[in-house]
């Protein structure tokens, strides 16, 4: 069975590499003069994919290889589109990808010893709130939200990393407590984070945090009624923001009638829809569209660019890949006998799912657009690095499950006292991490 899985993963890896090869060869001929730099960039991208694959295979022998290949494909699509739009930005994105892999490796190390996360959750919570408070005074405004910090001329978005920290903090707290009344502190933390994001006018991130919290709350407690009450409270908050913030009312009005304000505020939505329509089912071809007519074509509206040049069918395929990543992440969570690992996997899966839904739904005019990025695809270092950290969480959870299953099979065959001590330094007698081995999530 293992050999069949390896063959399947090898085929997916080959398909990802073939896509990168074909796309960059096409880009090298898309200009009037042959672009040799496209082939060099192609070699770097393919090397990055192979290095990531080998690192995960070496460090996490029981990790989710298919998920890793799906993430690599999304990153490759992003790099192809960025190079087609602006080769300088594509190089920056490649550097961000390398940093993201390092961040993923850091998460792998932290998740190996989640007992450390228990001790760090309070300092991490204080730091998260402190950073968001600091943004109120030193934050730079971009796209209507005051959520950027500039250090040595480099802009980054702290809220992207607060999202990851929130998952780990909530998982650490909720893994010890399942009664609703004992979850007051993590709830206050989540509410504080969401409120600070609303004050910064980063409503997309606030919505994202709220949905992730509700997912983790339900996974921890199983209280559907209380979760629905929380969802209703979030809905009430969203309604209140409509009446409080002028830019929210304008955004909703533009979403409802983009053609009525085509020459002004509705231009972005209209251009995005026209780009998707002009691409048709199979696309205009890589390099043949007019993506620069769309505002924010490298970030918020990159999905419209993908559909214009690769087609609606390809766009649906991208959505299917997100869905498959989320399903595999949720299955990893459900299969774990460790509450912390399970909640981390649920939180990471929910974050990817909601973020992809919000941005793609906004581009296709299903919901009002909010300024968040398309996971693993949009241009931006903060988002890509944070998404790779989420990938690290999911890979660690899958590897943990595989190792625990291997230990159980060994114990069944040879007995529990026959020297299988691979996990003794990180797990208790029941195979779960020391502080969270009470039972299943």
List each language-model region with its residue ranges:
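Hydrophobic alpha-helical transmembrane segments of multi-pass inner membrane proteins, especially
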Residues: 35-265, 307-362, 389, 393, ...
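A juxtamembrane structural motif centered on a specific transmembrane helix
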Residues: 1-5, 22-26, 359-441
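N-terminal membrane topogenic signal
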Residues: 1-17, 63
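Glycine/serine-rich anion-binding loops at beta->alpha junctions
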Residues: 153-162, 199-201, 280, 284, ...
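TM-adjacent membrane-interface loops and short helices in multi-pass inner/ER membrane proteins
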Residues: 258-299, 303, 312-314
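Re-entrant/interfacial helical elements at transmembrane boundaries that shape
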Residues: 149, 208-209, 271, 287-293, ...
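Membrane-interface alpha-helices at helix entry/exit sites of multi-pass transporters
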Residues: 4-7, 159, 182-185, 269, ...
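Transmembrane helix-loop junctions at the membrane interface of multipass transporters and ion channels
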Residues: 22-32, 86
């Amino acid at each position: 069975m293992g050999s069949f899985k390896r063959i399947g993963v090898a085929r997916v890896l080959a398909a990802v590499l073939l896509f990168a090869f074909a796309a960059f060869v096409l880009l090298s001929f898309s200009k009037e003069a042959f672009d040799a730099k496209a082939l060099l960039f192609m070699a770097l991208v393919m090397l990055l994919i192979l290095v990531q694959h080998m690192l995960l295979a070496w460090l996490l022998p029981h990790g989710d290889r298919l998920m890793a290949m799906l993430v690599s494909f999304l990153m490759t699509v992003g790099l192809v589109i960025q190079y087609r739009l602006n080769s300088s930005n594509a190089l920056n994105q490649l550097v961000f990808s390398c940093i993201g892999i390092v961040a993923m490796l850091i998460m792998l190390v932290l998740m190996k010893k989640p007992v450390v996360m228990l001790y760090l959750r309070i300092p991490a919570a204080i730091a998260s709130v402190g950073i968001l408070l600091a943004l109120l005074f030193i934050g730079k405004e971009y796209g209507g939200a005051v959520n950027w910090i500039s250090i040595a001329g480099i802009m980054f978005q702290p809220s992207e990393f607060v999202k990851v920290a929130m998952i780990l903090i909530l998982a650490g707290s909720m893994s010890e407590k399942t009664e609703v009344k004992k979850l007051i502190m993590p709830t206050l933390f989540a509410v504080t984070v969401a409120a600070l994001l609303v004050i910064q006018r980063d409503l997309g991130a606030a919505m994202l945090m709220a949905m992730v919290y509700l997912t983790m709350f339900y996974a921890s407690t199983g209280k559907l009624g209380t979760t629905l009450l929380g969802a209703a409270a979030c809905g009430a908050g969203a309604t209140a923001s409509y009446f409080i913030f002028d830019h929210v009312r304008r955004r909703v009005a533009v979403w409802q009638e983009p053609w009525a304000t085509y020459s002004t505020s509705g231009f972005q939505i209209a251009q995005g829809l026209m780009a998707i329509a002009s691409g048709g089912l199979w696309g205009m071809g890589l390099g043949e569209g007019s993506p620069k007519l769309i505002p924010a074509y490298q970030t918020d509206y990159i999905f419209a660019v993908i559909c214009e040049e690769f087609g609606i069918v390809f766009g649906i395929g991208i959505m299917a890949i997100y869905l498959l990543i989320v399903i595999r992440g949720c299955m990893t969570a459900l299969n774990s006998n460790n509450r912390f690992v399970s909640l981390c996997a649920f939180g990471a899966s929910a974050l990817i799912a909601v973020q992809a839904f919000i941005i793609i739904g906004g581009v296709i005019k299903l919901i009002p657009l909010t300024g968040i990025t398309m996971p693993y695809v949009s241009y931006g270092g903060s988002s890509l690095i944070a998404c790779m950290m989420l990938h690290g969480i999911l890979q660690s959870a899958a590897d943990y499950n595989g190792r625990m299953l291997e230990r159980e099979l060994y114990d069944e065959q040879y007995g529990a006292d026959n020297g299988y001590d691979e996990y003794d330094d990180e797990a208790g007698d029941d195979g779960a991490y020391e502080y969270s081995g009470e039972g299943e999530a």
